[in-house]
């Protein structure tokens, strides 16, 4: 067993694992009583080694039960070893904590917790709840430190393969700062954990026979022999003076000074003692309150007498204030009367002192005017007095109401004080009485409440720990997932390199075979054997590699059912197909993280589809497999929404069932020729041929002008493979034939198709003059190859992933995309075509050269960048010019045909001499 060969102790009483681990993390501590109030973080100077006695549940039969074991942690391997005693040289067994999770149950026995590994569940029990929590937290921390100390992630070979590693590491660092929010660190129980715990008395140690591990009997015997030898060697050392302790004990006492054991968790007292204590406290409280109630009553009486005196004094002050105001008013009135008398005296003196009558008359007039003015002032003051009197009456009424309200409040207050006095007397009497049956019920309820509080605290602690464990396991899972992702990316890169090397190897074998020819018999035979072995590698390795890693081999079919490696009868073609499949797989692996993943993310964030420049660029780059059906339905709806009607497709199917169409026979013949390299159309139990038949028959009734034309079966089949619905595939076919392609493209004369071939020749002369000159010198007609490209939009020509990428852009932009990709295909293979000098070799190469294209990104860049400028106006002009010339040629051909028929009709049927007639031939037996 790994880890069992630990270095033995020099003496039987020493502990072999007592060395402190270098760089061990410092553990912050806090007492359990502080958990609810908040966590303080005092740092411990030297954390003790994680070791101590725990009880392990195990055994079989009658000896099954708790067994005391000495546990110690190995930081190098992240293993928790255990032995029967601390003095044993060899551990009994170990627990791998790197992939373990921890659990504690609130309803289990106090101090019990579990360690769950993928292989087994170990149940352990600590002496106290505090020791259990300390062990769990330390094991969590050690597990995380081990995962954090693993070697760094492998460096990616390409920047595109780096992924989101830095972001995930930053997220993990941020989570480390928050991990302590679940469960506060527990104070170290120095008497139960650490090297010093080896000399502490073990709590409730089982009997010696029951404590022996029969499962590890050999290890038990070895440990016993080691202990016996150690005791013999150290027998003299045990009689040294008391002051001469061993260095290990001195070091242990210096490093870990065990604090005096704190008070343990209070046990649950019996019911009688709890009731008596509660009764005593309640009676003591009642007596103290009864001593205060009489003083409170006397105070209330004194307060009432003082309030009445204050009220009488206030009323007396109010009366004296009113009397003072009246005296002041009287003084003012007398003062005014005195002033009026003095003024009258002065006026009379002035009147008598006047010498002439004129002066006296003037004085009289002046007084008359003053009297009139005073009369007006008196009237104004009278009006003001009346308004003030009204205001005063209103205020007096309000004052009376307020006084009534105050009196009401005083009455209420007095009534409440009386009620308080009565209740106080009643409470005092109740407290003075002995506890009765109701009090005993109350005490029992109080006891139950205390038990429930204990249970609630236990469940709260369990919940905090489980949250902490979930957080820790999640962090470890994310770290492992990050490493796994980096390893998968590296594996994909190496697989791509392997595919490239294998394709180069096969290409080299093919070139050697071509160079040797049939001259060297032994070498040719050796090359043939090597090629056969290379072609059989895929089948032999597929079963073995698929178990290890799914993308390690090339699957037989792609996601749409097309063969990835076509089965050719000719050995050279099979070799080329294998090389092509390896190159496609290599490009797919290299582009998965660098190109496809960002593209998938952009499509995932794209909301509702709407025509835009961004959507145009995304469609040119290709639609991911999971988004393609939705995008195609939206593109088709844009094209045929003016033609769609509810129930139209079903009506066409019903019409086809009622009446047989003339094109039904040709459709039936073409069904078996549709995509022979696709499993959906070659499997006898597949439903795709029946769906395709119904779609083509419905279209023949939808468009009677065209009916059915060879090539429509491939267009409808592509739509069925992507959309997987008959009606959607039908409207896709309608969109292509009636809205995207020009008129007469699928007519009997294929007029528009022939026009596009001539337009393509002009564009090739403009964009690729060197290639066209090379082909022109060898009299190669490209229309034999390109005519079918345009008729079926490259179906059966390009490999499936490139074909569907072309269709993504074709359904949005139209026929212009077909011209771009046709030019790009010749540009992609221009150098290979220029190396061929014989016209027969060129024709042979043109028949399969589209299958050699494996880099879809390069082909797309050529089509939409290297072929620019590509104005639609130029395309329309070329089409118009060639259509006019082609129509003239067709008219001339029709005239020649009519003249020929007239000539034949004028000559009549001519029968060669000596040849028997049909009647004679039929008459012969």
From Swiss-Prot:
Feature: compositional bias, Acidic residues: 916-925
Phosphoserine sites (modified residues): 917
Region Interaction with RAC1, residue ranges: 297-435
Region annotation Disordered: where it falls in the sequence: 1-41, 231-278, 904-925
Positions of the UniProt region annotated as Interaction with CADH1: 1-171
Domain Rab-GAP TBC: 622-814
Positions carrying N-acetylmethionine: 1
Residue ranges constituting the PH domain according to the UniProt record: 47-144
Keyword entries, A-Z: Acetylation, Cell junction, Coiled coil, Cytoplasm, Cytoplasmic vesicle, GTPase activation, Phosphoprotein
InterPro entries recorded: PH-like_dom_sf (IPR011993), PH_domain (IPR001849), Rab-GAP-TBC_dom (IPR000195), Rab-GAP_TBC_sf (IPR035969), Rab_GAP_TBC_domain (IPR050302)
Primary site of residence: cytoplasm
GO MF terms, alphabetically ordered: GTPase activator activity
Keyword Nuclease appears in the UniProt entry: no
UniProt feature coiled coil, ranges: 302-475, 872-907
SMART domains cross-referenced by the UniProt entry: PH, TBC
SUPFAM superfamilies given in the database record: PH domain-like, Ypt/Rab-GAP domain of gyp1p
GO cellular component terms attached to this protein's record: anchoring junction; cell junction; cytoplasm; cytoplasmic vesicle; plasma membrane
One Gene Ontology term from the biological process aspect of the record: positive regulation of GTPase activity
Protein localization: Cytoplasm; Cytoplasmic vesicle; Cell junction
The keyword ATP-binding belongs to this UniProt entry's keyword annotation: no
Pfam families in alphabetical order: PH, RabGAP-TBC
Subunit structure: Interacts with activated RAC1 and CDH1.
Record function comment: May act as a GTPase-activating protein for Rab family protein(s). Signal effector acting as a linker between RAC1 and RAB7A, leading to RAB7A inactivation and further inhibition of cadherin degradation.
Name of the protein in question: TBC1 domain family member 2A
Organism taxonomic ancestry: Eukaryota, Metazoa, Chordata, Craniata, Vertebrata
Gene of this entry: TBC1D2
């Amino acid at each position: 067993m790994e880890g069992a060969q630990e270095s033995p102790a020099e003496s039987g009483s020493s502990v072999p694992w007592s060395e402190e681990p270098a760089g061990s993390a410092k553990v912050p501590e806090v007492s359990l009583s502080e958990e609810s109030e908040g966590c303080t973080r005092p740092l411990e100077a030297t954390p003790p080694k994680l070791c101590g006695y725990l009880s392990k549940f195990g055994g079989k039969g009658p000896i099954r039960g708790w067994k005391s074991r000495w546990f110690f942690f190995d930081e190098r391997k992240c293993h928790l070893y255990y032995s029967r005693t601390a003095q044993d040289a060899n551990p009994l067994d170990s627990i791998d904590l790197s992939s373990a999770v921890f659990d504690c149950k609130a309803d289990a026995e106090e101090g019990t917790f579990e360690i769950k590994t993928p292989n087994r569940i170990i149940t352990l029990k600590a002496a106290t709840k505090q020791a259990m929590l300390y062990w769990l937290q330390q094991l969590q921390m050690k597990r995380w430190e081990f995962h954090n100390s693993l070697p760094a992630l492998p460096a990616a070979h390409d920047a595109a393969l780096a992924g989101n590693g830095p972001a995930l590491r930053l997220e993990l660092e941020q989570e480390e700062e928050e991990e302590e929010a679940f469960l506060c660190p527990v104070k170290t129980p120095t008497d139960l954990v650490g090297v010093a715990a080896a000399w502490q008395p073990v709590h409730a140690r089982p009997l010696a026979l029951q404590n022996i591990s029969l499962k590890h009997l050999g290890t038990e015997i070895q440990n016993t022999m080691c202990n016996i030898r150690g005791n013999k060697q150290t027998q003299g050392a045990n009689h040294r003076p008391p002051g001469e302790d061993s260095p290990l004990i001195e070091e242990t006492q210096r490093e870990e000074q065990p604090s005096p054991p704190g008070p343990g968790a209070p046990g649950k007292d019996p019911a009688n003692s709890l009731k008596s204590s509660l009764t005593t406290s309640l009676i003591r409280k009642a007596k103290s309150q009864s001593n205060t109630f009489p003083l409170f009553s006397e105070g209330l009486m004194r307060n009432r007498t003082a309030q009445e005196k204050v009220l009488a004094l206030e009323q007396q002050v109010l009366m004296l204030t009113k009397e003072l105001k009246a005296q002041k008013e009287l003084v003012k009135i007398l003062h005014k009367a005195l002033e009026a008398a003095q003024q009258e005296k002065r006026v009379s003196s002035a009147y008598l002192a006047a010498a002439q009558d004129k002066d006296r008359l003037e004085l009289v007039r002046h007084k008359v005017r003053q009297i009139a003015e005073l009369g007006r002032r008196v009237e104004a003051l009278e009006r003001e007095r009346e308004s003030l009197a009204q205001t005063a009456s209103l205020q007096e009424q309000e004052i009376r109401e307020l006084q009534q309200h105050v009196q009401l409040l005083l009455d209420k207050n007095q009534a409440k004080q009386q009620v308080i006095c009565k209740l106080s007397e009643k409470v005092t009497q109740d407290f003075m009485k002995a506890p009765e049956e109701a009090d005993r019920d109350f005490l029992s309820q109080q006891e139950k409440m205390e038990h429930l509080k204990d249970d609630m605290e236990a469940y709260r602690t369990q919940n905090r720990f489980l949250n902490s464990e979930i957080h820790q396991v999640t962090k470890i899972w994310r770290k492992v997932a990050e490493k796994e992702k980096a390893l998968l990316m590296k594996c994909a890169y190496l697989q791509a390199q392997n595919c490239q090397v294998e394709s180069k190897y096969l290409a080299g074998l093919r070139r050697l075979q071509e160079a040797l020819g049939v001259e060297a018999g032994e070498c040719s035979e050796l090359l043939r054997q090597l090629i056969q072995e290379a072609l059989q590698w895929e089948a032999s390795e597929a079963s073995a590699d698929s178990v290890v890693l799914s993308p390690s081999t090339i699957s037989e079919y792609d996601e749409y059912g097309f063969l990835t490696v076509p089965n050719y009868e000719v050995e050279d073609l099979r070799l080329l197909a294998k090389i092509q499949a390896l190159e496609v797989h290599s490009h797919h692996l290299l582009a998965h993280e660098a190109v496809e993943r960002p593209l998938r993310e952009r499509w995932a964030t794209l909301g509702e589809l709407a025509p835009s420049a961004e959507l145009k660029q995304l469609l040119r780059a290709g639609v991911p497999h999971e988004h393609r059906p939705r995008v195609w339905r939206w593109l088709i709806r844009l094209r045929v929404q003016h033609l769609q009607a509810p129930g139209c497709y079903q009506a066409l199917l019903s019409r086809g069932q009622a009446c047989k169409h003339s094109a039904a026979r040709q459709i039936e013949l073409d069904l078996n020729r549709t995509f022979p390299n696709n499993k959906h159309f070659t499997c006898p139990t597949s439903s795709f041929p029946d769906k395709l038949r119904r779609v083509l028959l419905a279209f023949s009734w939808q468009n009677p002008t065209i009916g059915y034309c060879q090539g429509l079966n491939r267009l409808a089949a592509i739509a069925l493979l992507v959309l997987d619905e008959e009606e959607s595939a039908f409207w896709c076919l309608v969109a292509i034939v009636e809205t995207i392609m020009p008129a007469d493209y699928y007519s009997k004369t294929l007029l528009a198709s022939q026009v596009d071939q001539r337009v393509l020749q002009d564009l090739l002369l403009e964009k690729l003059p060197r290639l066209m000159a090379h082909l022109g010198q060898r009299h190669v007609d490209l229309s034999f190859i390109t005519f079918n490209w345009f008729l079926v939009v490259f179906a059966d020509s390009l490999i499936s992933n490139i074909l569907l990428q072309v269709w993504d852009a074709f359904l949005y932009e139209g026929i212009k995309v077909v011209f771009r990709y046709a030019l790009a295909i010749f540009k992609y293979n221009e150098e290979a075509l220029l190396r061929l000098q014989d016209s027969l070799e060129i024709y042979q190469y043109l028949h399969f050269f589209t299958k050699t294209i494996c880099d879809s990104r390069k082909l797309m860049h050529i089509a939409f960048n290297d072929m620019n400028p590509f104005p639609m106006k130029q395309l329309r002009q070329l089409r118009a010019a060639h259509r006019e010339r082609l129509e003239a040629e067709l008219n001339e051909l029709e005239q020649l045909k009519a003249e020929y028929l007239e000539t034949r009709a004028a000559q009549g049927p001519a029968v060669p001499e000596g040849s028997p007639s049909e009647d004679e031939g039929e008459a012969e037996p």
